């Protein structure tokens, strides 16, 4: 059996020892370095107890020879034979783990502590190694669980807080649309025609329906005066139950109508003497009216 290949693996067993396994004084936190030269080429790390891994493989007989418990100041029962030494460890590390140092798994070079099961089982309270020795064993914990959890807790707490889904903020209330002056469009309300009483005009500018009496009085006044003074306009408006604006507009329209008639009347040929004015607008070929100087022959012809 090649024992040299087994020396390239380290074992860090769990040290969950009870209070009965220690003396009144506590064990030192670090072990004195050994003067023996280690077989493997890896230097010991101070966090594993200082020189813990170097003296563990100083013999080529196959099993690591470690310092007896008496040199560490910790009394352990010497139930293990002289060829086997109980594993020493620091009380601040986890269960036994197997660390391959440079060799593949197919070589079968793992340092398995199954051969120490019977000897480790006889220790007080037992060790949490992988041996199948008798005796109650405490539950195993992940290596460096407490230290790593404490060191990574702040960092992971920030990540977990970021991963948590934050509740969606309630949508802000839509502010009412502000109306500016340039957005306002001035629109005049539509004018609705109101049925007014006869003779009562409205100042809204709608068409006024005059009665026969009102029209007769306005025509009589227009025959005498084409233009009215303001005093006369107010008097006529009060007499006919109209307002001043209605009287003013009626006279304006009446003057425009008179001028139109005069323009149209200038195109009609003047009526011969002796004919009534009503016949002036008839056709020129009408011969109903004859001058007194006309001969009877011209009339018959």
From Swiss-Prot:
Q: Does the keyword DNA-binding apply?
A: yes
Which residue numbers does the motif Antp-type hexapeptide cover?
179-184
Q: Which SMART domains match?
A: HOX (SM00389)
Residues spanning the membrane: none
UniProt keywords, alphabetically? Developmental protein, DNA-binding, Homeobox, Nucleus, Transcription, Transcription regulation
Q: Which Pfam families match?
A: Homeodomain (PF00046)
The family database entries (Gene3D superfamilies) matched by this protein are listed as: Homeodomain-like (1.10.10.60)
Residue spans with biased composition (Polar residues)? 19-38, 55-70, 284-301
GO BP: anatomical structure formation involved in morphogenesis; anterior/posterior pattern specification; embryonic skeletal system morphogenesis; facial nerve structural organization; facial nucleus development; regulation of transcription by RNA polymerase II; rhombomere 4 development; rhombomere 5 development
- Disordered: annotated span: 19-77, 127-149, 255-301
Q: Does the keyword DNA-binding apply?
A: yes
Organism domain of life: Eukaryota
Give this protein's Gene Ontology molecular function annotations. Answer: DNA-binding transcription activator activity, RNA polymerase II-specific; DNA-binding transcription factor activity, RNA polymerase II-specific; protein domain specific binding; RNA polymerase II cis-regulatory region sequence-specific DNA binding
Q: Which residues bind DNA?
A: 203-262
Q: Which GO terms describe its cellular component?
A: nucleoplasm; nucleus
InterPro entries of this UniProt entry? HD, HD_metazoa, Homeobox_CS, Homeodomain-like_sf, HXA1/B1/D1
Q: Where in the cell is it found?
A: Nucleus
- SUPFAM superfamilies noted in UniProt: Homeodomain-like
What's this protein's function? Sequence-specific transcription factor which is part of a developmental regulatory system that provides cells with specific positional identities on the anterior-posterior axis. Acts on the anterior body structures.
Hey, which family's this protein in? Belongs to the Antp homeobox family. Labial subfamily.
Which protein, by its recorded name, is this? Homeobox protein Hox-B1
Organism encoding this protein: Pan troglodytes
């Amino acid at each position: 059996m090649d024992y040299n290949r087994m020396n390239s693996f380290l074992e860090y067993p769990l040290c969950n020892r009870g209070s009965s396994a220690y003396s009144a004084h506590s064990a030192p936190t670090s072990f004195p370095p050994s003067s023996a030269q280690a077989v493997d080429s890896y230097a010991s790390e101070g966090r594993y107890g200082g020189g813990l891994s170097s003296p563990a493989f100083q013999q080529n007989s196959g099993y690591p020879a470690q310092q007896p418990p008496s040199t560490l100041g910790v009394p352990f029962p010497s139930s293990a034979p002289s060829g086997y030494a109980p594993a020493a460890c620091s009380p601040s590390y986890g269960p036994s783990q197997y660390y391959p140092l440079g060799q593949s798994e197919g070589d079968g070079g793992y340092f398995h502590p199954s051969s120490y099961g019977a000897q480790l089982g006889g220790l007080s309270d037992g060790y949490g190694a992988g041996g199948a020795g008798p005796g109650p064993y405490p539950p195993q914990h992940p290596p460096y669980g407490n230290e790593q959890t404490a060191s990574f807790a702040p960092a992971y707490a920030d990540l977990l807080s970021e991963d948590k889904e934050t509740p969606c903020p309630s949508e802000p209330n839509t502010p009412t649309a502000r109306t500016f002056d340039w957005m306002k469009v001035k629109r005049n309300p539509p004018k609705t025609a109101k049925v007014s009483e006869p003779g009562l005009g409205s100042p809204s500018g709608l068409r006024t329906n005059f009665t026969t009496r009102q029209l007769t009085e306005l025509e009589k006044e227009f025959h005498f005066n084409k233009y009215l003074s303001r005093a006369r306009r107010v008097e006529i408006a009060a007499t006919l139950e109209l307002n001043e604006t209605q009287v003013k507009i009626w006279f304006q329209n009446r003057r425009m109508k008179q001028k139109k008639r005069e323009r149209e009347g200038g195109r009609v040929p003047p009526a011969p003497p002796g004919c009534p004015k009503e016949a002036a607008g008839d056709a020129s070929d009408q011969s109903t009216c004859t001058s007194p100087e006309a001969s009877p022959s011209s009339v018959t012809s």
